[in-house]
Amino acid sequence: MAEKKADKRAEKRKFNTEAWEPKTQIGRMVKEGTISDISYIMDKGLPLLEPEIVDALLPDLEEQVLDVKLVQRMHKSGRRARYRATVAVGNKNGYVGVGMGKSKEVGPAIRKAIAHAKLSLIKVRVGCGSWECGCGSPHSIPFAAKGACGSVKVELLPAPRGVGLVAGNVAKAVLGLAGVKDAWTKTFGDTRTTFNFAEATFDALNNLNFVRCLPNQKEKLGLTEGRVL
């Protein structure tokens, strides 16, 4: 019975490409089948302006709500309260995104955060950069990286196979959705702020893409970008 309900929920969540009416040129190219791989969009530096593009090209994308909080701001008529949701999305195979959404209700806030996370999707570099391992398989990160958001700073370090994700719950969720299985982390600042913590981890993963490597170094580190086949 539980399996049938899970299958029905999966069918409801399945993206219907035929019913989708794209608003941008890239969206139309995706629907027509001209673009069939999201890595093409990212390699060309084309803008992701519709979350439906990600739904169509990455059907195995998973979502995880990291935090929902009630926030307030002052207005001339008094205090105004809204819900703020922080969400991470990823396919556990080289793609990850982090987003935040606000609304008067929890549901719309989470949906806004999911859409924002899909639009901020990046390709993640994975590999084996630990001197203790050197297996050459893409289970960790290829080299150390740093990221920051607000007062939070995160440093990611390659770890040997079997160590797992030595990180806080928020960083562990982001790294797991990115497809990183083994890594050490160092954190500084007020990590209780969930969005800043998630965004700093996301920034560190993004900074991996700006390191230049020679072909022989890529082979030694087992460096892979995006989806691992």
Curated annotation (Swiss-Prot):
GO molecular function: rRNA binding; structural constituent of ribosome
One of the record's GO cellular component terms: cytosolic small ribosomal subunit
Limits of the S5 DRBM domain: 61-124
One matching Pfam family: Ribosomal_S5
InterPro entries associated with the record: Ribosomal_Su5_D2-typ_SF (IPR020568), Ribosomal_uS5 (IPR000851), Ribosomal_uS5_arc (IPR047866), Ribosomal_uS5_C (IPR005324), Ribosomal_uS5_euk/arc (IPR005711), Ribosomal_uS5_N (IPR013810), Ribosomal_uS5_N_CS (IPR018192), Ribsml_uS5_D2-typ_fold_subgr (IPR014721)
Keywords recorded for this protein, A-Z: Ribonucleoprotein, Ribosomal protein, RNA-binding, rRNA-binding
Keyword Repressor: no
Domain commentary: The N-terminal domain interacts with the head of the 30S subunit; the C-terminal domain interacts with the body and contacts protein S4. The interaction surface between S4 and S5 is involved in control of translational fidelity.
Entry's family note: Belongs to the universal ribosomal protein uS5 family.
Subunit composition and interactions: Part of the 30S ribosomal subunit. Contacts protein S4.
Function noted in UniProt: With S4 and S12 plays an important role in translational accuracy.
PANTHER family xref list: 40S RIBOSOMAL PROTEIN S2, RIBOSOMAL S SUBUNIT
UniProt protein name: Small ribosomal subunit protein uS5
The gene coding this protein: rps5
